[in-house]
Amino acid sequence: MERMIEVCAGSYQDCIAAYQGSAKRVELNSALSVGGLTPSVASLVRVKKETDLTVICMVRVRAAGFCYEKEDVEIMFEDAKILLDHGADGIAFGFLNEDGTICEEDTKRMIDLIHSYNKEAVFHRAFDVTPDAFEAIETLIDLGADRVLTSGQKAKAMEGIDLIKVLNNQYGDKIQILPGSGMNAENAKMMMNYTGVYQVHSSCKSYKADATTTKTVSYTHLRAHETDSYL
């Protein structure tokens, strides 16, 4: 299996940079400062028009956790359909119950929608807050998910590398395991060699100053080093 890095992109510009760097697949988001939200349709359309990247689109209506109100769920399904109609090659999503277990009803419904377009269904790092990784991954396999993005239920994937290895050894022939969080050029090879996975997910981010940001008007809550930066 050919090894690859999926680039986590926060904008059209990020996708172009990834493409110029020979990336083959991106996960397109907005608002990476809060972990990634649903991107604009226009950014997807422009990326598909100008590149041959495989584009997985995040569908996440808000920041924070992954247990949603009914209205938010319906909005995410509408977003997913619109993105798929406009060329998305897959959708990254995650639905949990209040107890942290996978919401099987909404997850199955989303997988079926994505597969009706013959595209990839990717369960994102909501997986990492489930109480039982093995029960969760078996649920995803039973529901038909194609891939799961995971840091091995730790803050960073290298911290969860042993669980990632076990998951790949036990389930890698049934679902793709995609390690993500803290992955970079220095540790990607070690992750692949140790766990047996053939792909990793990395944001490869850099920061760009925006002269219009100020310290007297706050638009969001950012970590200190991002206060004057655009992601």
Region spans (language model):
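Hydrophobic faces of well-ordered beta-strands that scaffold small-molecule active sites
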Residues: 3-7, 26-28, 55-59, 91-93, ...
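Glycine-rich beta-to-alpha transition loops that act as phosphate-gripper elements at the mouths
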Residues: 7-12, 58-66, 74, 125-132, ...
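Catalytic cores of alpha/beta
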Residues: 14, 68-73, 132-142, 183-196
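Glycine-rich phosphate-binding active-site loops on the catalytic face of alpha/beta enzymes
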Residues: 27-34, 93-97, 147-157, 198-214
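Active-site-adjacent beta->alpha loops and helix N-cap segments on the catalytic face
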Residues: 34-50, 98-113, 130-135, 155-168, ...
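Glycine/small-residue-rich loop that forms an oxyanion/phosphate-binding "nest" at active or ligand-binding sites
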Residues: 55-102
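Conserved small/polar residues in nucleotide/adenosyl-binding loops
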Residues: 220-227
